[in-house]
């Protein structure tokens, strides 16, 4: 190896160990000597170890990378740049501290991890203490995590506008990721309230539920902040393993055990497919960081053979299959109806609300920011998923008689709208997706609050069959009216909250001339209104020989119903008020 090459690799190895500010300074210094934009991008890519064959770079004389004269000039003059840095003693000004920034910027995750570890030690020891007569701790544990989430919410809110990389560029916290975390914690508050009331009324003492649920939330925090395939896979597996345990929460129930086993087997298969896709992307590019992959797609698009991009596309396809399995997009939906029906109602609420927040926003961030140059591929792939999800979700729900299976197919149909918005690759499309998932989660919380309230007074059993809703209006008119408004909103009837989420998706797709899929989704949205209207017909107009008397609602559920119903009814006026004040 020549002296020039030795200086080049010495300089390169140094900057691989430096932080992001040093990298920016390095690019700025290159700009002083070289004006060619491609050379600068190549230098930026190379200094972050883009290629697995970096050490053999100079042996590829016939490669398209080295045929470029600008790159040859860059390599030949690297020694001059290296001497310039040495003469000005610029290398000695750089420092890197692992704990200086990482703990501060990852404080919400670290705090939540500490709360989980502390609660496991404290509640397990106290719950098995003979001195305290083996106390029941589920309610106390639930309150502990409720306040822990409350403090975590303010820790995230305090760092909302920060934009930084943590743990050697494996995590990235910015405004978008922190906003998703805030919404995730907000939804978790309702799940904790659901669990406290559910365990109290059903006489359950499963305080382990709160540990596992908090672990899944922690995994979702890491998932939305992940900036490399390593952190991404570890985070999504932490979330998935926690959800596998939650699916089998009722150990004495055969339905819960069967649902947990189905979810575990199919979820493990999806994780294998996802890992295989990651390995293909890494094998063809040698890249684990997302921003490196984005730069590679942009900078080297015209300098590699088609087999390289075919490998990336195959890896991207397998990775998206694993992700869309997690949210239940058709045709990867086969686990949703059986799992939703078999798991306890509390776990069904978690499956329907929590994972979709993080995974949909991660897909939005990943494909729009790092794989935007592959729009020609994932645009068609998302349209196919949207088309298939509309069909399966709409027609699969028409003949369902159980509420949880009806909800499962309805969730598949909603994923179709999200895929339609993701396929647009426009700012309006991505904004409509984020707004849709926001409204979907709020309506899901409202719907599950209603389902939790449907409990018979005489035998203390829950209502899971839609035929049992007959004559409900005669028993509780106000509650039936709230139920009716919620169903209309989910169906997309104006001027309720659910209408605007679908309206913005349609508006963004028509703006991009997606006329056929827009009309098709609009038609199936009208068809899907049938099974919501059927529920309303049973509640208001069907006569039943027996009367359904419900148990009194808890104070927490009553407040949730009032608040979310008010938001559902007056969402248009509230949004107009805030928009006018922001101008």
Pin down the residues of each PLM region.
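Alpha-helical transmembrane segments of multi-pass membrane proteins predominantly involved
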Residues: 2-17, 23, 31, 41-42, ...
């Amino acid at each position: 190896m020549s002296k020039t090459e030795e200086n080049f690799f010495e300089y390169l190895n140094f900057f691989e160990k430096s932080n992001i500010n040093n990298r920016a300074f390095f690019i700025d210094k290159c700009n002083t000597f070289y004006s060619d934009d491609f050379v600068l991008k190549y230098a930026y890519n190379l200094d972050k170890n883009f290629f697995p064959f970096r050490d053999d770079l100079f042996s590829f004389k016939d490669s398209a990378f080295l045929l470029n004269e600008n790159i040859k000039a860059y390599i030949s003059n690297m020694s001059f740049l290296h001497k310039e840095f040495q003469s000005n003693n610029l290398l000695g000004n750089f420092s890197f501290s692992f704990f200086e920034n990482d703990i501060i910027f990852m404080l919400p995750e670290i705090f939540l991890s500490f709360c989980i570890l502390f609660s496991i030690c404290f509640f397990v020891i106290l719950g098995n203490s003979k001195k305290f007569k083996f106390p029941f701790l589920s309610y106390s544990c639930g309150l502990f995590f409720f306040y822990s989430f409350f403090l975590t919410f303010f820790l995230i809110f305090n760092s909302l506008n920060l934009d930084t990389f943590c743990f050697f560029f494996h995590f990235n916290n910015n405004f978008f990721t922190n906003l998703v975390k805030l919404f995730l914690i907000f939804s978790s508050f309702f799940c904790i309230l659901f669990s406290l009331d559910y365990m109290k009324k059903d006489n359950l003492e499963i305080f382990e539920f709160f540990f596992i649920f908090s672990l899944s939330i922690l995994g979702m925090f890491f998932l939305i902040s992940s900036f490399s395939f390593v952190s991404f896979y570890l985070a999504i597996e932490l979330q998935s393993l926690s959800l596998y345990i939650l699916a089998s929460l009722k150990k004495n129930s055969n339905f819960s055990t069967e649902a947990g086993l189905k979810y575990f087997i199919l979820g493990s298969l999806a994780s294998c497919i996802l890992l295989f896709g990651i390995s293909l992307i890494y094998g063809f590019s040698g890249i684990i960081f997302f921003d490196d992959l984005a730069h590679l797609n942009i900078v080297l698009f015209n300098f590699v053979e088609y087999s390289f991009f075919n490998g990336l596309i195959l890896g991207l396809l397998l990775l998206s299959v694993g992700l869309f399995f997690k949210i239940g997009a058709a045709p990867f939906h086969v686990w949703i109806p059986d799992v939703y029906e078999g798991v306890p109602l509390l776990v069904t609420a978690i499956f329907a609300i929590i994972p979709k927040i993080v995974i949909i926003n991660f897909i939005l961030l990943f494909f729009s920011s790092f794989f935007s140059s592959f729009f020609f591929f994932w645009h068609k792939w998302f349209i196919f998923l949207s088309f298939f999800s509309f069909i399966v979700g709409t027609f699969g729900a028409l003949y369902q008689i159980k509420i949880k299976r009806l909800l499962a197919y309805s969730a598949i149909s909603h994923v179709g709208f999200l895929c339609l918005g993701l396929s647009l690759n426009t700012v309006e499309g991505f904004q409509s997706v984020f707004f849709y998932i926001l409204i979907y989660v709020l309506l899901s919380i409202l719907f599950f609050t209603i389902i939790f309230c449907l409990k018979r007074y005489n035998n203390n059993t829950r209502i899971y069959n839609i035929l049992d809703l007959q004559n409900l209006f005669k028993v509780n008119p106000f509650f039936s009216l709230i139920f009716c408004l919620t169903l209309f909103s989910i169906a997309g009837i104006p001027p309720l909250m659910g209408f605007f989420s679908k309206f913005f998706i349609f508006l963004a797709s028509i703006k991009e001339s997606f006329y056929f899929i827009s009309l098709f989704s609009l038609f199936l949205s009208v068809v899907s209104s049938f099974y919501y209207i059927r529920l309303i017909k049973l509640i208001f107009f069907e006569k039943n020989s027996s009367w359904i008397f419900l148990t009194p609602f808890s104070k927490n559920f009553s407040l949730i119903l009032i608040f979310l119903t008010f938001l559902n009814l007056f969402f248009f006026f509230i949004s107009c008020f805030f928009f006018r004040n922001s101008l």
